[in-house]
A protein has these predicted regions:
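Disulfide-rich extracellular ectodomains of metazoan secreted and cell-surface proteins
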Residues: 39-40, 53-55, 63, 123, ...
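Phosphate/oxyanion-binding active-site loops and adjacent basic polyanion-contact surfaces
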Residues: 19-24, 65-75, 108
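Loop/turn elements at helix/coil->beta-strand transitions in domains of secreted/extracellular proteins
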Residues: 39-43, 90-93, 120-127, 148-151
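VWA/integrin I-like adhesion module and closely mimicked acidic/polar interface patches used
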Residues: 67-68, 102-145
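Surface-exposed acidic, glycine-flexible loop patches that form ligand/cofactor-binding
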Residues: 33-39, 80-90, 117-120
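Von Willebrand factor
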Residues: 2-58, 93-99, 133
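Short coil/turn segments at secondary-structure boundaries
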Residues: 20-22, 58-60, 110-111, 141-142, ...
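Von Willebrand factor A/integrin I-like adhesion domains
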Residues: 133-171
Length: 171
């Protein structure tokens, strides 16, 4: 049976204070709950980023501080993908969800290009959940990450994730 890897990358900087931070925590809990009751084999990897990247747990309170350094999150994601490739021999398909506040620091391009060399990332489904208004450099990051504007969303529901997982497993 195929394993579906779900990589949830989120902004944990000062930009998520208030409503955006609450929505990120809520989304992480919903995604975790949806995957707990999924009949398919799934793995959830939650990566937060600010000045440094870190792993988060599904029902953990997220402190908002630091700068939104997306390159740090991409480095951590690259490390996780490399580790998974070394130790996972089963066929896997991946969904990447990037939850952003709408601000990204410069320096992400090199890390994103490295990720596109990774087969799992290049052929995975990539979505962005965006809050706030994005400036020009952030819009470029959003479009380069997803490659299609239809995958830049304002909300990502449990139902959408469950149907994606089902389509991946059956397809």
């Amino acid at each position: 049976m195929k394993t579906v890897n779900i990589y949830y990358i989120f902004d944990a900087s000062v930009k998520i204070r208030g409503n955006a931070g609450h929505r990120i925590e809520e989304n992480i809990s919903r995604i975790s709950r949806a995957l707990d009751f999924s009949p398919y084999k799934t793995k959830l990897h939650i990566i937060g980023y600010r000045d440094r990247a870190f792993f988060a747990k599904p029902h953990e309170r997220i402190g908002a501080y630091g700068n939104p350094d997306f390159a740090e999150g991409l480095k951590m994601l690259g490390n996780v993908l490399d580790y998974g490739r070394k130790y996972e021999h089963a066929k896997a398909r991946s969904v990447f969800i990037w939850h952003t506040s709408g601000t990204v620091l410069e320096g992400w391009k090199k890390e994103l290009e490295k990720l596109y060399k990774n087969r799992e990332f290049a052929f995975g489904l990539r979505y962005v959940v965006q809050h706030g208004v994005a400036d020009r450099s952030t819009k470029e990051a959003l479009y380069r990450f997803t490659e299609t504007p239809e995958r830049i969303l304002h909300h990502f529901s449990e139902g959408r994730l469950c149907s994606l997982v089902e389509n991946i497993v059956r397809g």
